[in-house]
Structure formats: C-alpha cells, structure tokens
Regions:
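Extracytoplasmic cell-surface/polysaccharide-interacting catalytic and binding patches
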Residues: 2-259
Length: 259
C-alpha cells in the first residue's frame, strides 16, 4: 500500500515545485515589464520637459510690441537718462537690442547654439567657393562691452564712438546672435567698409540670408539703426525672416515696426 502511495507523493511534490517555479518566473517577468514601463514614463516626462523648456526659450512671454518712448533721442541716438530694463525686449519672438531698447545688465545668454550652427554652415559654404571667412567677434558680456566702449570713447570721443560702438547694455553682441565676420589673410579690411567691396564680402552679403543672417547695419540706414554702415556685422534671425528683410531691403527695426 505504501509503495502504491510513493509515486503519488513524489508526483505531488513535483507539481508543487513546478507551480512555484512558474509563479517565480512570472513575477520576475512582470517586475521587468513594470520597471521598463516606469523608465519609459520617466523618459517621456523628461522629453516633455525638455521640449517645454526649448519652446519657452524660443517664445518668451514678453513678445508684444513695446510702447514707444515718450522722450526723443539725443544727438547720439540714445534716450536721455534711460535706465537699463529688468527684462529684454522681444517682438514677435525676436530679441531686439538697439539704442532705444537695451538689455538688462544681467542678461548673459552666452552664444546662441542655433546661430553658431548656422554660422558654421555658412562659413563652410563660403570656403567651398574659395572664401576663408571667420567670425572674429561674437558674444560679449556686459563687462567686456563696457571695457570696449570706454576704450573707444577715450580714443575717439563719445560722439564718434556712438556711431560704431554700442554702449554697454545696448550691444547686439550681448544677445549671442551677432557676429563680426572677415576674411583670413585680409585682416587689413576687417572692421572697414572696404570688406563689403571684396569678393568675399559680396558673397557673404548675397548668401547670408540663406543661412538665417542679415547685414544688421546696412548702407544709408544710419538714421534708422543708429549706427554707421558695418559691412562685417551680421545678425542671426532665422531663414524666413532673413530672406524677407533682405528682399525688402529693410532693417530689423523696420521689419519689427519700431521705426
């Protein structure tokens, strides 16, 4: 009788062992799936946060057209006794920095990565055409612009300096979107109108719009921009806007409706 029960007992133990094994495997797999699901959820949330941050940077809240100043600019184009703002001025998502709409002294965005990438593409295209262009000046801090401007004033006087150099807080270079460009090997025409007459300068003027850049201070527009013609100073605004500004032969101020 005992011998007849032994196979039954062994079989029962084997069945129980199989059930336990199946339960353990199932539980392990289920935990793996849940962990993967949780990780995916975290990744998705991280991506959403990154996208929201990017959108916030590209489309700041203060994008409405600013109120026109009540005062009239002085002989150098600046508003008398103007204090620097606490927030930068954006119009339709475009950052503006000029003699009327300055930047906060604490505004320090560093160089804009999108502008740098577009610049690199433009310089590479120029090199394929035989022009070795280089951006010899880009982002500047408030402190550096202060030193630069003060040196120009000491050398040339304030009235002369105000025609070609921005006061600290008013410089496009502080936006991280502007670059001074010249041709290697022809440094003698850097920062001169003559650069615009060279084949390299003419190529740059003709093709900058294709990469999202505009000549920021064009000829015969000093009364609008506040600065003399600068054949070397280019500002990134994006391809669509750059093409429209170039086609219409207008300045950024005219495009934004602040002149």
């Amino acid at each position: 009788m005992k011998n007849n029960r032994l196979p039954l007992i062994v079989g029962a133990f084997i069945s129980i062992a199989l059930i336990v094994a199946i339960f353990v495997v199932y539980n392990y797999k289920n935990n793996q799936v849940n962990s993967a699901s949780d990780e995916q959820s975290k990744t998705t949330e991280t991506n959403k946060t990154t996208e929201q941050d990017s959108t916030a940077i590209e489309k700041p809240d203060n994008t409405e057209t600013p109120a026109k100043p009540e005062q009239q600019p002085d002989e150098n184009g600046y508003l008398p006794n103007q204090t620097l703002p606490t927030e930068p001025t954006y119009i339709n998502g475009i950052l503006l920095a000029n003699k009327i709409y300055p930047l906060p002294s604490t505004f320090a965005p560093e160089e804009n990565p999108e502008a740098r990438e577009a610049l690199n593409q433009m310089l590479a295209a120029a090199k394929q055409q035989g022009f070795d262009l280089v951006a010899f000046s880009g982002y500047r801090s408030f402190e550096y612009q202060t030193t630069l401007y003060d040196n120009y004033v000491k050398r040339d006087g304030q009235a002369a300096a105000d025609r070609y150099s921005a006061r600290p807080g008013y410089s496009e270079h502080q936006t991280g979107l502007a670059f001074d460009i010249g041709e290697r090997g022809k440094e003698d025409v850097w920062l001169t109108e003559a650069f615009g007459e060279t084949p390299a300068g003419q190529w740059l003027f003709a093709h900058a719009q294709e990469y999202g850049f505009i000549l920021r201070f064009p000829q015969n527009k000093e009364e609008i921009t506040g600065y003399m013609y600068e054949s070397w100073h280019y500002r990134y605004v994006g391809k669509e806007i750059a093409k429209e500004i170039t086609k219409k032969n207008i300045t950024l101020e005219e495009y934004l409706g602040v002149k």
